[in-house]
Structure formats: C-alpha cells, structure tokens
Regions:
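Residue-level marker of structural boundaries
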Residues: 23, 47-48, 59
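Conserved acidic carboxylate
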Residues: 9
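Redox-cofactor binding/interface segments in oxidoreductases and associated redox assembly factors
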Residues: 52
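Two-component/phosphorelay signaling modules centered on CheY-like receiver
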Residues: 12-30
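The short loop immediately C-terminal to the conserved phospho-acceptor aspartate in CheY-like receiver
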Residues: 55-57
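Acidic, metal-coordinating helix/loop segments flanking the phosphotransfer/catalytic sites
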Residues: 31-49
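Non-catalytic signal-transmission and effector/linker regions of two-component phosphorelay proteins
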Residues: 1-6
C-alpha cells in the first residue's frame, strides 16, 4: 500500500508539478486548492503527509 500525500496549494501548476513527481515515485496523491477543500480531504481520510502552501488563502 502506497503512502498518501495531500498537496494543498492554490497554484494549479505547483500542484500538478509536485503531484506528477510524487506519483512517478509511487505515492498516492490527493490535492486541495484552498483551505476549505483541504479540510474536506482531511476529514475524508487523514493523509500520511501534507505538503502545504504557507501563504494559502482561506476560502
């Protein structure tokens, strides 16, 4: 079973770049574009790791 990583970033290009690299290395990746989406994803299933944009806007 692969480790699951949640990428939280409002920049689609960054999410796609990081996601592609991680998937190529065998990780399962979920994405969220904002704070609210991130909370929904976390409530569905807690990821093993989260990569978070430190300047993420709430919303």
């Amino acid at each position: 079973m692969s480790k699951e990583i949640l990428i939280i970033d409002d920049n689609l290009d960054i999410r796609q770049l990081v996601s592609g690299i991680l998937v190529d290395h065998g990780f399962t990746v979920r994405e969220a574009a904002n704070y609210d989406q991130a909370l929904l994803e976390i409530n569905k299933k807690l990821p093993d790791v989260a990569i978070i944009d430190v300047k993420l806007d709430k919303g």
